[in-house]
Amino acid sequence: MLQNHSIAEFDPVLWDAIQNENRRQEEHIELIASENYVTKAVMEAQGSQLTNKYAEGYPGKRYYGGCEYVDIVEQLAIDRAKELFGADYANVQPHSGSQANAAVYGALLNAGDTILGMDLAHGGHLTHGAKVSFSGKIYNSVLYGITAEGLIDYEDVRVKALESKPKMIVAGFSAYSQVVDWAKMREIADEVGAYLFVDMAHVAGLIAAGLYPNPLPHAHVVTTTTHKTLAGPRGGLILSACGDEEIYKKLNSSVFPANQGGPLMHVIAAKAVCFKEALQPEFKAYQAQVLKNAKAMVEVFKQRGFEVVSKGTENHLFLVSFVKQGLTGKAADAALGEANITVNKNSVPNDPQKPFITSGIRVGSPSITRRGFNEADASTLAGWMCDVLESIGKDNYDQVIAETRAKVLEICKRLPVYGD
């Protein structure tokens, strides 16, 4: 018999962990570039009765009965995704960005085929051909990188493409702060007869707002997550505007039944909500502020003598290198965490440290902007971060941490996430 008990009543240990996480999110400043705060409407969709419904297949072609209403939900998400990004194909079923990427590879490649992707150590993603990932184990991965100035080396991409003759070139990143020339990538792909696959997960929100170039006119296939700058539920999305129906059929089959079974209908509903939110004028204003806040923070770090990789940012994130200071990313991450400022350690180009230690941090502005931070707030925050970083290993460290934590708590109270 169904028991309608609350988590607090039934599982107080779990409830305490949830409440403590709620408190942490309210009392800490979130600067992890891949994180964001969803609206209550998105959470409402994820907590709906749609979680009960199994719906293998696609709208109108299900393997289960009783799907007439979840068909409406999924079709809404599909139509809104197409409108948002200018696509003529959308698959909203991938459970994550990595699973979306796996589906693209499965649709267009065979095991052992060559892919050319961005080196993880230079800003790429695990699924772009890293040897520890399925993408580097199942496929023959060749990697391109960035120049000494921190910019994608398109000549390096072209030379390696001509040498390796990849079946697919992967463009996109997880830690690159400049604008990718999608047209140049397509030109190189066409020169060697390769597919161009773009993973726009980090900048999807900026693209939706028209503030970062859209890869859809250039790529054969595009994937994204639905969180990060898009500020929706954790999930994946596959898009295309290439007009090739055979590719679309292969993509659908690669998601289901090849890689996944039943879709998560409650998450797809939340994706539909987030796509509608991203179609509103307020969303563009939000993304514009994300850019302004990131740029404001960069200027402070540079003024305080820290190296910003590629010398700036044209999106929501930037990397700070501590090679010159002899500081590790792990130590910086931990120190900032003590002050209630959350970042992630990150490798920088030619990093002398191991990937779990690193010599840098990645900083992102989406979450603070959702709280209501403006450029002045962002600049002030960057100054506090520099104070903490400069105090590491010095006698005043504990004092700086305590003072910074107090200031963080004050601004978090002034600019709450949810306000209740």
Swiss-Prot record:
GO terms for molecular function: glycine hydroxymethyltransferase activity; pyridoxal phosphate binding. The modification N6-(pyridoxal phosphate)lysine is found at residue 228. GO terms for biological process: glycine biosynthetic process from serine; tetrahydrofolate interconversion. (6S)-5,6,7,8-tetrahydrofolate binds at residues 120, 124-126. SUPFAM superfamilies: PLP-dependent transferases. The record marks 227 as: Plays an important role in substrate specificity. Disulfide bonds: none annotated. It holds the Pfam family SHMT. Belongs to the SHMT family. Homodimer. This is Serine hydroxymethyltransferase. It comes from Mannheimia succiniciproducens (strain KCTC 0769BP / MBEL55E). The gene is glyA.
